[in-house]
Design a protein with these regions (language model features):
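Catalytic cores of nucleotide-sugar-dependent glycosyltransferases that transfer UDP/GDP/TDP-activated
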Residues: 1-473
Length: 473
């Protein structure tokens, strides 16, 4: 069997170039890569289909076909051109997706993969077009949905035109509605994601969130080849570097390792630490920043968006007198990240994820697999992951509650660390994720792929206008 992953945004290459450095190179790419590799290890032939880019600023993505060394025989990265040669952010891909699908069909000479799995709204729409053109079946994994984003941006009749021009919500919502309607199954990471996000009024009539036949809840996994208790190939070097650079080595660290995005609410966790004499006495703060060793000196090197998130964090650290209590860690790869987690785990440290909302929460599972105790937002996926008591759940909007949760985790660090390690082994591995995907795909292959939609045009402006009008009443 050959399975095609539809993921036009971002890109893939053997060295994971640009990951976490751009909004289109985040956790979704990790997810697609790891599920694809795990399926290949199960003996399935896998193609990760993305966009070909021939741009001097993005030289890694110019080859039409490449591979991951660990699974060269069964997994290909296939780059299909569309929309010209230059890199395009995901918001600019919408007019070119039909061209991309035409390129996919041309690449396979109409001998398409046996089944597709689509990712995000743009990949989902590609699945819809492929189904219309070839009767191919597909699953849809949304990762995040446009309705929640426009709500968070407080979209209303007054600002709808400008926000739609920037984020193309009318196209994205239409693509999501079509993907939900046409997919053989919708895959979510948690039950909460299914029941809350897919029940949004903008998806009414496209899918019923309570319909068990339309959904499969499949948790993501941890790359246990990298994130685990056993030392990796760079641990010795990372340990030497941290030992040389960091003060007060035996004190626990409160580890914050999230991309510089306002949604991650790093400021809330830093405020919890800075405002708590108890935490400052018991532990130091370790703040992870990619490609930056001293942000007070190097903040100008960061992109404007990241700089705007980091500036108030640095101001708070400085104004509260906590600068001498904070360490900055530059983790340049996943291997370095995991090695540093193991280093801090040996010092009874705690990982904190204080996102205002986290759709799933892979980062705390990775940290827990390396031996850190976990404090995580109660909003979103972590509420299910840690429902068994393997982590401490907190209200991310309340710095005092975050501080209290961190204090609890520090007090019982060994117990929490062991619980989350067991939780990872039993539930959150990519092998289990791939096995569940395969079961859903095999069931989908037995279904008839009849189109449910009369039109697949990307225009949800009527639904959007109606929703915003009701919301403003």
């Amino acid at each position: 069997m050959r399975i095609g992953f539809l993921n036009p945004q971002g890109n893939f290459d053997p060295t994971d170039s640009h990951w976490t450095e751009h909004p289109d190179f985040g956790g979704q790419l990790v997810y697609v890569k790891e599920v694809g590799l795990a399926l290949a290890r199960l003996g399935i032939e896998v193609d990760i289909l993305t966009r070909r880019i021939k741009d001097p600023d993005w030289p890694e993505f110019s080859e039409p076909v490449t591979h991951y060394d660990s699974e060269r025989e069964r997994l290909r990265i296939v780059r299909i051109p569309c929309g010209g040669d230059s890199f395009l952010a995901k918001e600019a891909l919408w007019p070119h997706l039909r061209e991309w699908v035409t390129g996919i069909m041309r690449f396979y000479d109409n001998r398409l993969p046996d089944f597709f799995t689509s990712h995000y709204a743009d990949g989902g729409y590609a699945g819809v077009v492929l189904k219309q053109e070839s009767s191919s079946g597909f699953t849809f994994t949304g990762h995040s949905l446009g309705a929640q984003k426009l709500d968070k941006l407080d979209m209303n009749p007054a600002n709808s035109k400008s926000l739609d021009a920037r984020f193309h919500f009318s196209r994205r919502i239409a693509a999501e509605r079509l993907s939900m309607r046409e997919a053989s199954r919708i895959i979510t990471s948690t039950g909460q994601e299914r029941m809350e996000q897919y029940a949004h009024p903008l998806y009414a009539s496209a899918v019923e969130s309570g319909d068990d036949e339309r959904f499969a809840v499949i948790p993501p996994g941890v790359n246990t080849r990298i994130f685990g208790a056993e030392p990796g190939p760079v641990d010795e070097a990372v340990t030497a570097s941290l030992t040389e650079r960091l003060p007060d080595l035996e004190r626990p660290r409160i580890v914050i390792s999230s991309r510089l995005d306002e949604k991650k609410n790093i400021l809330g966790a830093v405020r919890a630490y800075c405002d708590s004499p108890v935490l400052r006495q018991r532990a130091r703060l370790a703040l992870y920043l990619r490609d930056v060793n001293d942000p007070f000196e190097q903040i100008k090197n960061l992109p404007p968006g990241e700089r705007s998130v980091l500036e108030p964090i640095l101001h708070l650290i400085d104004s509260s007198g906590a600068r001498s209590y904070v360490d900055f860690v530059n983790a340049t790869s996943q291997q370095v990240l995991a090695a540093s987690y193991r280093f801090f785990a040996q010092r009874a440290s705690v990982f904190v994820l204080s996102s205002l909302y986290e759709p799933f929460g892979l980062a705390p599972i990775e940290a827990g697999a390396c031996g850190l105790a976990v404090v995580a937002t109660r909003n979103g996926g972590p509420s299910e992951i840690f429902a068994d008591g393997s982590g401490v759940l907190v209200d991310p909007a309340n710095p005092a509650a975050i501080a209290e949760g961190i204090a609890r985790a520090l007090a019982d660090q060994g117990d929490y660390a062991e619980r989350i390690r067991q939780r990872v082994r039993s539930t959150y591995t990519w092998e289990r994720t791939a096995e569940s995907y395969l079961a859903v795909i095999e069931a989908g292959r037995r279904n008839t792929n009849t189109m449910r939609s009369n039109s697949i045009e990307l225009d949800a402006s009527v639904q959007l206008k109606r929703y915003l009008a009701r919301r403003g009443e």
